[in-house]
Design a protein with these regions (language model features):
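Feature captures the catalytic ectodomains and active-site-proximal regions of enzymes
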Residues: 1-388
Length: 388
């Protein structure tokens, strides 16, 4: 048996008055996910333990089948793995955003979705002028970068806040309680002002040390691959011993190469037992608070990823799991910890046993289902074991 996991990041949402009480997922045209819902098993899964924040790092770890309460150490070390940065035992890795702050307010946690080519020059200049023993900057993709600091310089216990959680808010309440980090942030403002870039400062967050996790092959007996534009998921894949496949034109935004991701996934499925395909666009639209963009991202995910995969499977008896990692409601413009809707479907299996018939894939319709997975990391075992 082959397995595909299709992740629409932040896809689920709340009813909106602008959509006459519908969610973006409900308002979007999603014939392919609807087909899976009609012929598969629908349910709800909670990917975020109560003890942890509702980040993509925590929720994605659950989707991969690992208990975040046991293995999660922070986002930074996973992104370090993606960039090929080897952490020493005492290193603390921070995700380092390039952000736009004006008048003391977090205007844009993406710095206008700064181009990677421009961002690379910015990060190289920051490392040249601010980097020193125990402090190193690494360029990533667009606004997403890495800062590695020795624990002798900054404690991993320092409290930080994701910049996407404070869009439109004054930043002074959310600054890290660390003299070194504040110094780096303040000095970055001077450098970025000189460079005349959309980014006005750096924002370090999501810190942690290297996690110790068994490989996916060891835990589940399957070989696998990950397809994503996001360093976090690439790092997760590398940490778990999965092949990370880079797709040309994958941007982590609405202009990503959806079809390319689907086609590369089908090709990878010939080599591996399981392939994870992650699409960031719905989450980005949620953070922007844009209803039209979120609907467009969901429809593109359905048509170009889900549809391409389902049509391309042919006679291959693969199982498909479709789900978000967490909600990113338009109303809040950030992640929340509520359960998310999922559908599991098997190719060439006309009608699977389920407790209730769902006619479409959205939050309202799936409320009919009594299938509930309380601990998200348990879903993977049920999925590959044919228990759902």
């Amino acid at each position: 048996m082959k397995y595909l996991v299709l992740i629409g990041d932040g896809m689920s949402d709340l009813p909106l008055k602008e959509l006459k009480g519908k969610t973006p997922l409900e308002a979007a045209k999603t014939p392919n996910m609807d087909y899976l819902a009609q012929n598969g098993v629908c349910g709800w899964v909670n990917n975020v333990p109560q003890s942890l924040p509702p980040g993509s790092d925590v929720a994605s770890m659950s989707i991969f089948g690992y208990d975040p309460a046991k293995y999660y150490t922070g986002r930074g070390p996973l992104e370090a793995a993606s960039l090929g940065v080897k952490l020493a035992k005492d290193d603390v890795a921070f995700r380092c955003n390039l952000v736009t702050v004006k008048g003391g307010i977090m205007k844009d946690f993406t710095a206008g979705h700064i181009k990677t080519s421009e961002a690379r020059k910015v990060m190289q200049e920051l490392d040249k002028r601010l980097g020193r023993k125990g402090i190193k900057f690494y360029p990533g993709l667009s606004y997403r970068h890495l800062l590695v600091v020795s624990s002798a310089v900054v404690s991993g216990a320092v409290k930080t806040v994701p910049p996407h959680d404070i869009t439109g808010k004054k930043i002074h309440k959310y600054l890290p309680k660390s003299d070194i980090l504040l110094e780096l942030m303040n000095e970055s403002e001077v450098i970025l002002h000189e460079m005349k870039t959309k980014a006005t400062m750096i924002w370090p967050w999501g810190q942690g040390k290297l996690p110790s996790m068994p490989s996916f092959k060891k835990k589940y007996g399957l070989t696998g691959a990950v397809i994503t534009a996001v360093d976090l998921l690439k790092g997760m894949g590398k940490t778990l011993g999965l092949e990370v496949i880079n797709v040309p034109g994958a941007t982590g935004y609405l202009d990503t190469n959806y079809i390319g991701k689907a086609k590369y996934a089908l090709k990878a499925l010939k080599k591996h037992d399981i392939v994870f395909v992650h699409v960031e666009a719905p989450d980005e639209a949620g953070h922007e608070g844009s209803i039209p963009k979120k609907i467009r991202a969901i429809e593109d995910f359905d048509k170009l990823v889900v549809g391409t995969v389902v049509r391309g499977l042919g006679s291959l008896g693969a199982r498909i799991l479709v789900l978000p990692d967490h909600p990113t409601p338009i109303k809040y413009m950030t992640h929340t910890r509520e359960a998310v809707p999922f559908v599991a479907w098997q190719a060439n299996d006309k009608c699977q046993i389920t407790n209730v018939k769902c006619w479409s894939y959205n939050e309202k319709e799936l409320k009919k289902s009594k299938v509930r997975i309380k601990h998200g990391h348990e879903l993977m075992k049920k999925f590959i074991g044919g228990k759902i």
